[in-house]
Amino acid sequence: MRALLCSHRLLPLSSLSRTTVKTKSHNPKTLYPNNKPRWESKLHAGPKGFQSSRTSEKPGRPDPDPEDDPPIPQEVFERMMGRIVVSVGTPLGLGVAILKVLEVLKDRNVWDVPLWVPYLTTLVTFGSSALGIAYGSLSTNLDPAKTNSLFGLKEAKENWVEMWKEDQ
């Protein structure tokens, strides 16, 4: 190939006509500056979320009674937040740790991890972490004078029944 290209001083391309192209390669009317959008969009609707609350009330609904739900005592609130942090953080941390271990096993060629294993791990651990929010709040004893059990199963059963009583 090298001998073929070097054997001629001038390439055969020089025999092409040297006429200039008479058409322009671009039309200046179709070019848009980079700092301006191609088309201007206009809002066709007005804001609806900033109206007064009186116009959006339904006539058949009574006003909620502020005394209907008593406030949660600070001690119970702190216990509830602690339970939520533990019941969310434990499966979340475990899930991240398992994914990291699976990554190390695959990188060091110890175990060729099937693709479904990380997906299943993520589903189980992160899903139980999401359920931990509800369990953390349900497993807290709502009486400030009483203490919680270790896992809160008894409190969760009591609070579950109480929660469904209030709805009916």
From Swiss-Prot:
It comes from the Eukaryota. It is a multi-pass membrane protein. Disruption phenotype: No visible phenotype. It is found in: Membrane. GO terms for biological process: NADH dehydrogenase complex (plastoquinone) assembly. Keywords: Membrane, Transmembrane, Transmembrane helix. InterPro entries: PAM68-like. Residues 55-64 have a biased composition (Basic and acidic residues). One of its GO terms (cellular component) is chloroplast thylakoid membrane. Pfam families: DUF3464. The chain crosses the membrane at residues 84-104, 113-133. Residues 18-73 are annotated as: Disordered. Its main location: membrane. Has no redundant functions with PAM68. This is Uncharacterized protein PAM68-like. It comes from Arabidopsis thaliana (Mouse-ear cress).
